């Protein structure tokens, strides 16, 4: 390993000599000596002798390398305690340099499995797992001092059988996972929510149509405005209205092509599909009326970034639709109207904001991949560290 290469990857040392073979050995010594005692701060130090410390370093041109550091042990004449000099890029008690450990962490984070990485680096699988856990824990500790984000998305995702659910807290403004906590009820999340810093600074919280999460937010985030997630509201309307169509015309259960036409937005149909849909609706006028309501309601729910003056007309239209659904003769429409009435304030707020839990759902997909890579590991703390490291 050349002096320039060592200075680029591990600065702070002077090369004494190096031996080039299958294993490249580089003999170095630290440039800076300690100036004071780490225990008492005294400046009267005495050298007690030298010793060699061997650490693994990054490979050079395909050859593994080892750095042999000539270290000194010092004694403080003020307090009488002895200590070893700190080494740049090498933590106490470690047998490898920080650049090498970070390289192993990044390669494992990129998808190289533990067994393959251990074989390539001539390490044990336990060592690779320990290095990865140390770096992820270091990243997770940085979150302890962070305040809650101003725009927060809360949703649940499933885990293994022994621990069925976990709650995800997503920073929608910065598009990253803030934290995850086991459980989804207020009793399970109470201790975690009590430890959060800056809960009073949260301005907006986006959730699905969950009564338990709404009650939880009103208690623990009193200054936050609750916004309904647009995807879940539109899906709720689609499910109930299409259920009416299936009850009116039971043949839709096996005529999936017609059901797909009813499910698709009208402006996304090609001319052939639109002609087929018109012919079907002409034969089924009841389904035609339900389809027209579905189109108008979904178009209203998909409106974004409106000011408060523009929202006034939209509110009148929404209330008219809700009243029409609640007075309908179909039980599914009545259920939908009651749900929209109970969540009308949260639904109206989503017209003012463009952020939604689609960001959180995307991270849930990535978290499923993390669970597959860590298959068999049931420790939630380990899973949380991996999620924060890769999604935070």
Q: What are the functions of these language-model segments?
A:
Residues 233-252:
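Short alpha-helix plus adjacent loop in nuclease-associated cores
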Residues 86-87, 170-176:
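Gly-rich Lys/Arg/Thr-decorated short loops/hinges at beta-loop-alpha junctions or inter-strand turns
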Residues 30, 34, 39, 46, ...:
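Acidic/histidine-rich catalytic cores and adjacent linkers
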Residues 124, 135-139, 224, 244, ...:
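The DNA-recognition helices of helix-turn-helix-type DNA-binding domains
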Residues 1-87:
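Short, conserved DNA-binding cores of transcription-related domains
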